[in-house]
């Protein structure tokens, strides 16, 4: 059984989430098709050849035909949109991963469609493409529209309900009193990287608005676990990074302290990881990792989690969860 997929042979409400399919796949590709159709409709108003490449300051320095430009647009955009969109809509993946990946589809499509508009609008009715300067207005509009669509769809995503755990955790696991909420900050190296990324992103605005947008949007994945807060409540274990999740207490089967090494587990952030060397725990998990270090394994009847916590707190958090589960199961 693949615990990353929540152990379901088939999701009770279907394999796909309809709202996500529409917002992450259908709507973006429909918008892309509309932009491509508009581009073909204004072909007669464009110079021949058209400007297809621009220098650092936005001046045209490469030329080609409209058909080739649209083919490249479709060849680059559609596969990326399908990969991100379908991953975001597939119910077999936990909601937190779908919220991370799915919105990237409308954002990317909006950016690429905006780039086409920014390329062609300055050339409408121009006798020649020489001297044309690339705009950036439509790239920002397309990106903002895609971001709004992606965010709205991400908010309404749902996880199929996992069954309740049938018994209390193994008696050998730690028990303890109620724990305090904790916060884990990323490593110094990642803080330096984030600061450098911000500096480069701001500087790129002077060179290329398109590069600024790409770097700015990528920043989400750099800092999505910059700071992670976790607390144990009577009804759920709740954590929050840039996005968060609640793990219902009734679905938890065990909590135990462990360690997370980003070098062995695919990095930091929110990701699917696998620990083939752990006896009895070879299945995939969702890691919420701001750095390497002490972590908390939370096993459930659905998705399993590994959440990095401040050093010295994993035992107390695991003990609190297991003690609450003992009381829950009487």
Residue spans for each PLM region:
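N-terminal membrane-targeting/pre-transmembrane regions
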Residues: 2-17, 121, 128-141, 146-202, ...
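Alpha-helical transmembrane segments and their helix-start/interface "positive-inside/aromatic belt" motifs
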Residues: 14-30, 94-104
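Active-site and channel-lining beta-strand-loop segments
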Residues: 38-70
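Hydrophobic alpha-helical segments
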Residues: 81-133
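Transmembrane helix interruption/hinge and helix-loop junction motifs
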Residues: 203-212
């Amino acid at each position: 059984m693949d615990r990353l997929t929540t152990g379901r042979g088939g999701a009770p409400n279907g394999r796909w989430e309809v709202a996500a399919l529409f917002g992450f796949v259908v709507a973006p590709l429909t918008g892309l098709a509309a932009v491509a159709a508009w581009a073909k409709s204004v072909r007669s108003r464009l110079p021949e050849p058209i400007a297809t490449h621009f220098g650092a300051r936005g001046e045209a320095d490469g030329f080609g035909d409209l058909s080739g430009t649209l083919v490249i647009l479709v060849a680059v955009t559609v596969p990326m949109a399908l990969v991100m969109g379908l991953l975001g809509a597939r119910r077999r993946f936990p909601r937190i991963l779908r919220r991370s990946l799915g919105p990237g589809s409308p954002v990317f499509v909006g950016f690429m469609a905006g780039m086409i508009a920014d390329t062609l609008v300055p050339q409408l009715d121009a006798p020649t493409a020489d001297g044309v300067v690339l705009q950036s207005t439509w790239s920002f509009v397309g990106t903002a529209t895609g971001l709004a669509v992606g965010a709205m769809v991400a908010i309404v995503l749902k996880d199929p309900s996992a069954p309740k755990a049938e018994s209390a955790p193994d008696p050998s696991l730690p028990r303890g009193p109620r724990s305090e909420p904790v916060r884990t900050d990323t490593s110094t190296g990642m803080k330096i990287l984030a600061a450098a990324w911000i500096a480069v992103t701001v500087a790129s605005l002077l060179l290329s608005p398109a590069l600024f947008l790409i770097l700015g949007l990528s920043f989400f994945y750099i800092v999505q676990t910059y700071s992670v807060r976790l607390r144990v409540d009577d009804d759920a274990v709740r954590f929050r990074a840039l996005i968060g999740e609640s793990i219902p207490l009734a679905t938890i089967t065990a909590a135990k302290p462990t360690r997370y090494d980003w070098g062995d587990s695919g990095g930091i952030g929110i990701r699917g990881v696998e620990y083939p060397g752990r006896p009895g725990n070879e299945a995939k998990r969702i890691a919420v990792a701001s750095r390497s270090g002490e972590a908390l394994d939370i096993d459930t009847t659905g998705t399993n989690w590994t959440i990095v916590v401040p050093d010295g707190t994993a035992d107390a958090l695991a003990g609190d969860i297991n003690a609450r589960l003992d009381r829950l199961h009487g």
